Curated annotation (Swiss-Prot):
Organism: Danio rerio (Zebrafish)
GO biological process, alphabetically ordered: mRNA stabilization; negative regulation of cell differentiation
UniProt EC number: 2.7.7.19
GO CC, one annotated term: centrosome
Keywords attached to this entry: Cytoplasm, Cytoskeleton, Nucleotidyltransferase, Nucleus, RNA-binding, Transferase
Subcellular location field: Nucleus; Cytoplasm; Cytoplasm, Cytoskeleton, Microtubule organizing center, Centrosome
Protein name: Terminal nucleotidyltransferase 5C
Length: 388
């Protein structure tokens, strides 16, 4: 009995009922029309999150896959809880909690999601000849399936050219659902979805559903305090994967501060090591970095350079697991990416104001070395030459 009481206590500690202001922001997110952009000649779909979530859920249950609950996850959940923390939410990340005992369920889920997209095609489009494969090629940005002993989940990400992809994740089990306390929030949507089904009245301060938020970090109040005060904290850092380094630097560039700088200095070393374990090849590192910049800095182009400089500093100061040339290779990749970002912003300094200093080769110091060819020159040349 004591153990049941402890479990109940932990659950209540990790959950909290949303205020009306938070429910109102949630309603805005769920009812806003989000464009899903098609490739080639395929039309743009106007999708409201509440509609696609309801339709997918109902059709999954008709096909025998019971949905335990549906949750809003990630930066969008953080936006609902605390509106102004210096960053805008990106992907619309929704989790369907389901049982996935066999791989066959993954195919069924994909079929349901793709067939649902047909209902969002504009009137006048001939749907008869459009196959699921065609819809996948036209509208799916990313398709992921993970089926191991510890992780069973799939992700279907629908394309948005502005970086606000609709991400539908179907989760049976997953080892870790957050990296830091500020991205550990999930908002349970079932009561809101029922409200949309059953009530004809718009939500108001005096008439709205009770909505519960949960922190996977554990203590909801503590995690919300971290989000409000822009502080960085985590638990079980050994579970953080390689992408945690990129997320950590993203928080730093947005002026989040570690709760314990000394502790996080050690954690930086761990995150750098984990990054190079998960992405050992320079080509993989480049692909990962470019994908992260593309998906997390839409509309924030000027922040990219600052982010890259922070990432370079952390890698330079905290990398202990690499050979010297490997470390320099990664630092060079980050520097070149930063330079390209400046070029894209037309922010490269005027070269006329830059002075270049040339270091003589070591053998020039050798007093015995006198094998110089001296060319005659009739005009005087200044000591320092401008780069242009």
């Amino acid at each position: 009995m004591a153990s049941a009481s402890t479990s109940s206590s932990n659950e209540s500690e990790s959950q909290s009922v949303l205020t009306w202001e938070q429910v109102s922001r949630l309603n805005d997110v769920l009812t806003e029309a989000v464009p899903v952009h098609g490739r080639g000649n395929f039309p743009t779909l106007e999708v409201r999150l509440k509609d696609i979530v309801q339709m997918v859920r109902n059709r999954l249950e008709l096909r025998g896959i019971m949905v335990k609950d549906v949750r809003l996850n990630g930066s969008t959940a953080s936006h609902v809880l605390v509106q102004d923390i210096g960053w805008s939410y990106k992907d619309l990340d929704v989790i369907f909690r389901v049982d996935l005992p066999r791989e066959e369920e993954f195919q069924l889920i994909k079929d349901v999601v793709l067939s649902t997209l047909l209902d969002f095609l504009p009137e006048g489009v001939n749907k008869e000849k459009i196959t699921p494969m065609t819809l996948k090629e036209a509208y799916v940005q990313k398709l992921v399936k993970v089926y191991t002993d510890q992780d069973r989940w799939s992700l279907i990400s629908l394309s948005n050219n502005n970086g606000r992809n609709v991400e539908l994740k179907f989760v049976d089990s997953i080892r870790r659902q957050f990296e830091f306390s500020v991205d550990s929030f999930q908002i349970i949507l079932d009561s809101v979805l029922s409200y949309y089904d059953l009530s004809e009245n718009p939500m108001s301060q005096h008439f709205h559903p009770t909505v519960v938020g949960e922190s996977m970090y554990g203590d909801f109040v503590e995690a919300l305090g971290h989000l409000t005060n822009k502080t960085i904290a985590t638990k079980r850092p050994e579970e953080i994967r390689g992408g945690g380094l990129l997320k950590y630097c993203n928080l730093l560039v947005r002026e989040f501060k570690p709760t314990d700088p000394d502790e996080f200095k050690a954690l930086e070393r761990y995150m750098c090591s984990r990054f190079f374990i998960d992405f050992p090849d320079i080509v993989e590192q480049q692909r990962k970095l470019e994908a992260y910049l593309q998906s997390h800095f839409i509309g924030e182009e000027r922040n990219k350079y600052n982010y890259l400089m922070i990432l370079r500093r952390v890698v330079n100061e905290s990398t202990v697991c690499l050979m010297g040339h490997e470390r320099r290779q990664t630092l060079n990749l980050i520097s070149l990416t930063a330079f390209r970002v400046l070029a894209e912003q037309n922010a490269i300094p005027d070269v006329s104001s830059v002075t270049c200093y040339y270091q003589p080769a070591p053998y020039v110091k050798d007093l015995n070395f006198n094998n110089y060819y001296v060319a005659s020159c009739n005009q005087s040349i200044p000591t320092w030459l401008p780069c242009n």
